Design a protein with these regions (language model features):
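Active-site-proximal region of nucleotide-activated glycan assembly enzymes
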Residues: 1-43
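Short, conserved active-site loop motifs that form the nucleotide-linked donor/cofactor pocket
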Residues: 3, 24, 113-114, 180-181
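Conserved catalytic-core segment of nucleotide-activated headgroup transferases in glycan assembly
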Residues: 29-121, 128
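C-terminal amphipathic helix plus adjacent low-complexity
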Residues: 52, 62-64, 77-80, 90-92, ...
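Short acidic loop-to-helix transition motifs that present clustered carboxylates
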Residues: 120-123, 143
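Catalytic binding pocket for nucleotide-activated donors in carbohydrate/polymer assembly enzymes
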Residues: 129-130, 134, 138-221
Length: 240
C-alpha cells in the first residue's frame, strides 16, 4: 500500500475511489507517461510476413496470459464472420501456441488462421503495426504499453472497459487521443464494433487519419506536458 496513487478521471471514476486504500491523485490528462521519441513507423507490406495483401489482419500483441477464454471466443467468432481474415498474436511459448490453436480447432476454426509474430527489433515491431487492420484489446487486463505502441504506429485498437484499473487503461489512452468511439463496455458491443469496422474500410481509414492527428495534437506522446503536470502535483502535495 502506498500513500498516493496517480490516476486520471477515466482510469478511476470518482465512484470507485472507495475501493482504494491510497489517496487518488488525478492527472489532468492520461495517467500513462509516454516517450515522444519512439522509432518512427516505416510502412510495411503484408507480404513481408507471408500474408496475402487482401487478408484482413486482426491482431493482439499483448502477453498470452492476458487472453481470457471469453475474449478469445470473440476473436474466433470474428474469424468465423470475416472471410479471408487471420488473427496475429505475439509470440509467447510453445504451450500457449498449441493450446490456443487447439481451442480454435475445437471451435471450428482452421488453426492456420492464427499466426504468431516473432520477437524482432523495436523498430520493426513498431513498423509491423502498419499492416494490422484492427488491433483487438484483451480483457479484463487491457493492453498498456502495447496499446500506445499501436496508436503511435497509427493502428486502431478496439478495447472493452470494465470497472477495474487494469480494464480501463486502453480506454484512458484512446480518450486522450480522441478515439472514444473505440471504447466498448460489453462483449456484444465489442464484437459488433469489431465486425463493423472489419467490413467498413472507409470508416477504418477515417479512424487511422484521426489517430494520426491525435498522435500529433494530443498530450499522449508529449512527455514534457506529462512532466509539467506531475511536477505541479508534487508542488501541490508539498505545500499542503
Amino acid at each position: 500500500m502506498y500513500d498516493f496513487l496517480l490516476s486520471d478521471d477515466y482510469i478511476i471514476p470518482e465512484n470507485q475511489e472507495t475501493f482504494y486504500a491510497e489517496q487518488i491523485i488525478r492527472l489532468p490528462n492520461c495517467y500513462q507517461p509516454n516517450i515522444g521519441n519512439r522509432p518512427q513507423p516505416k510502412a510495411m507490406e503484408k507480404s513481408h510476413y507471408g500474408i496475402d495483401d487482401t487478408t484482413f489482419i486482426f491482431a493482439s500483441f499483448g502477453q498470452s496470459v492476458k487472453i481470457s477464454e471469453d475474449i478469445f471466443k470473440v476473436w474466433l467468432n470474428l474469424l468465423k464472420n470475416k472471410n479471408n481474415s487471420i488473427l496475429w498474436l505475439l509470440e509467447s511459448n510453445a504451450h500457449a501456441h498449441e493450446n490456443l490453436k487447439a481451442y480454435a480447432r475445437e471451435y471450428g476454426i482452421d488453426s492456420d488462421r492464427i499466426i504468431f509474430a516473432d520477437k524482432v527489433e523495436f523498430q520493426e515491431h513498431i513498423s509491423r503495426h502498419t499492416i494490422i487492420d484492427l488491433f483487438l484489446d484483451t480483457y479484463p487486463y487491457n493492453a498498456h504499453t502495447s496499446a500506445s505502441d499501436a496508436l503511435w504506429a497509427g493502428c486502431p485498437i478496439l478495447t472493452m472497459s470494465g470497472d477495474t484499473f487494469a480494464s480501463r487503461v486502453a480506454g484512458s489512452i484512446l480518450k486522450e487521443i480522441g478515439c472514444d468511439d473505440l471504447i466498448t463496455y460489453d462483449i456484444k458491443e465489442y464484437f459488433n464494433k469489431a465486425l463493423y469496422l472489419a467490413n467498413n474500410e472507409k470508416d477504418l481509414m477515417e479512424l487511422k487519419k484521426r489517430i494520426a492527428r491525435g498522435r500529433t495534437n494530443s498530450s499522449l506522446f508529449k512527455p514534457k506536458t506529462f512532466v509539467k503536470n506531475l511536477e505541479d502535483i508534487y508542488s501541490s502535495l508539498l505545500t499542503t
